[in-house]
């Protein structure tokens, strides 16, 4: 199960945070800093996308200048969540048309809607890009 999902840029600014476990505001701030300090200096060529973190694992993937991080239980399948992160980015790319950091900042409510279509209650919910995009199309018609 996911504890949280963070999208941060190279400077450590959080562009999206979704919490699936209860944390206080102080804990959230501390976690954001710790996760960024853990994943930002890692070398993509020589180090894996999985990092031990407290009693969990951080599964992360870097796209351009953004780090997509998910905190999962140690007994969860890391590769499934790594693929789910990639799937989430593919859906963002298809929805926004070559997504960038500014899309996340100015359309954060749509990004949260996409995230909620892919993940539900800390678990992977949907794995079909076409199903997610169809649902998002219906949501866009309501606006």
Curated annotation (Swiss-Prot):
SUPFAM superfamilies membership: SNARE-like
Keyword Acetylation listed: no
Highest rank taxon of the organism: Eukaryota
Span of the signal peptide: none
Places the protein is found: Cell membrane; Membrane, Coated pit
Annotated GO MF terms: clathrin adaptor activity
Keywords attached to this entry: Cell membrane, Coated pit, Endocytosis, Membrane, Protein transport, Transport
Any one of the GO BP annotations: clathrin-dependent endocytosis
Main localization of the protein described in the UniProt heading: membrane
InterPro entries, per the entry: AP_complex_ssu, AP_mu_sigma_su, APS2, Longin-like_dom_sf
Membrane topology summary: Peripheral membrane protein
Any one of the GO CC terms: AP-2 adaptor complex
Role this protein plays: Component of the adaptor complexes which link clathrin to receptors in coated vesicles. Clathrin-associated protein complexes are believed to interact with the cytoplasmic tails of membrane proteins, leading to their selection and concentration.
Family statement drawn from the similarity comment of this UniProt entry: Belongs to the adaptor complexes small subunit family.
Subunit structure of this chain's protein: Adaptor protein complex 2 (AP-2) is a heterotetramer composed of two large adaptins (alpha-type subunit APL3 and beta-type subunit APL1), a medium chain (mu-type subunit APM4) and a small adaptin (sigma-type subunit APS2).
Entry protein name: AP-2 complex subunit sigma
């Amino acid at each position: 199960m996911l504890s949280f999902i963070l999208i941060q840029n190279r400077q450590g600014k959080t562009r999206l945070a979704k919490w699936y476990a209860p944390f206080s505001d102080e804990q959230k701030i501390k976690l954001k800093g710790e996760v960024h300090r853990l994943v930002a200096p890692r070398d993509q060529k020589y180090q894996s996308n999985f990092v031990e973190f407290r009693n969990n694992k951080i599964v992360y993937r870097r796209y351009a200048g953004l780090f997509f991080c998910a905190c999962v239980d140690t007994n969860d399948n890391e590769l499934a969540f790594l693929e789910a992160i990639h799937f989430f980015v593919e859906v963002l790319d298809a929805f926004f048309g070559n997504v960038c950091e500014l899309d996340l900042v100015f359309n954060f409510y749509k990004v949260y809607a996409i995230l909620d279509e892919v993940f539900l209650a800390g678990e992977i919910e949907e794995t079909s890009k076409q199903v997610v995009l169809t649902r998002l199309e219906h949501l866009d018609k309501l606006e």
